[in-house]
Amino acid sequence: LQDAVNAIGDGMGTIQVAPGRHSDCAVQGAGDIAYVAATPGQAVFDNVACEGKGALVLRGRSAKVAGLVFANIRVPDFNGSGIRLEKGNLTVSQSWFRDSQQGILAGIDTASSITIDKSTFTRLGTCEGPGGCAHSIYIGDYGSLSVTRSRFEAGRGGHYLKSRSRRIAVLNSSFDDTAGRGTNYMIDLPGGSSGRIANNWFVQGPNKENHSAFITVAPEGKQYSSAGL
């Protein structure tokens, strides 16, 4: 996998991932790369992480991920992720993140956007680490985040979706905490955000660490306006 990423370099290309369980991981440092399952749902990145971070560590111009499964990813700092996004645009579709410390963890890139569609996040999150909780999705200070037609379920700690992005859209998705353990909020916007949260389905589970809210807005202070949210 890394050889294929290196071959594309600063250009544009598509990597087709064959069915099966893969112990490969890759770091993308440039270019625009699509990672596509040859058969959606049958290509699994299992128990593998590059740089002690995640199966795909992305810091190029853009990346697209389609039809892939990320499973059993754990690292010593408790932030093991299917995708670790450090900068650039990201589009994820028809993918499954499960049984890991985090699904997607993104850093800071206020000029870029993240789009997630038709994807599932199962048994993710942990509060084991000394640095605080990991979450199913945790997005840093990004330009925008869009999550549509996706499912979050059976969390294992932290929040289902935490985002510090300036703009947010969470539409037509489900958050089922019925089988969750030690979970917190469904959606946490710690610094505020503007946009739209609509047509979602929320089920509060019995084994939560925090039952106080489904959605929180600016609990850590107002970094961005939430006017019109």
Where are these regions (language model features)?
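Right-handed parallel beta-helix/beta-spiral solenoid domain characteristic of secreted/periplasmic
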Residues: 14-19, 26, 30-78, 125
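Glycoside hydrolase catalytic-domain groove-lining segments
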Residues: 196, 202-210, 225-229
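Detector for repetitive beta-architecture
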Residues: 12-14, 19, 32, 42, ...
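Right-handed parallel beta-helix/beta-solenoid
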Residues: 1-7, 19-21, 38
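Flexible, charged surface loops at secondary-structure boundaries
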Residues: 6-11, 28-29, 58-59, 85-86, ...
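Extracellular beta-strand/beta-solenoid scaffold signature
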Residues: 2, 47-57, 76-84, 99-108, ...
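Feature marks extracellular polysaccharide-active and adherence modules
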Residues: 18, 36-38, 46, 59, ...
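Extended, compositionally simple hydrophobic/Ser/Thr-rich segments
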Residues: 105, 113-114, 127-128, 145, ...
